[in-house]
Amino acid sequence: QDLFFAAYLAVRQNQITGFPAQLHFMIDHILNALKNDSQLLIFVSKNLSWNVFQAALEQKMPDRDVRFYDKYLQLIEEGHQAYEHPDLLLFSVIELASSTCYNCILYQQPVPLEEYMPYLHKSIDGILSSYQKDSSDTSAD
């Protein structure tokens, strides 16, 4: 859970604006933390399932009476863009990043993480696009 909180705080501290840029920044922040701590990466890869991610998202942020997931939803709202099923959107991005970056970080296979990142960002943009609500559909909120 600390990875999520640290990534969120880094977005705010660096004044990243726009939900897509914020999401990319948070994913990059988490992946860089995992890259710098291979033991944590191994632990995460062996012990994390969606249930563990969900539990981390539901826990309250340290020293605050708010959940990370609430802050995630706030970032979406501040970005003035609506997404269908923001929970599934986050699930898709987390699963994509965790499943594709493990070997890039630990073994530099098929390429090192730095080389893979632009492709990961394009894939995340595709996920964002596929979950984006039509502007005519915003009244259904």
What are the functions of these language-model segments?
Residues 39, 53-80, 87-91, 125:
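Amphipathic alpha-helical packing segments from all-alpha helical-bundle domains
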Residues 14-22, 52, 56, 60, ...:
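A structural signal for alpha-helical segments
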Residues 2, 6-37, 93:
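Hydrophobic alpha-helical connector segments
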Residues 25, 29, 71, 119-123:
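Alpha-helical elements of Rossmann-like donor-binding domains used by nucleotide-donor carbohydrate transfer enzymes
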Residues 46, 76-124, 131-141:
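Hydrophobic/aromatic-rich alpha-helical bundle segments in the mid-to-C-terminal region
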Residues 3, 36, 40, 67-71, ...:
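Amphipathic, well-ordered alpha-helical segments in soluble domains
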Residues 8, 21, 33-56, 70, ...:
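Amphipathic alpha-helical segments used for helix-helix packing
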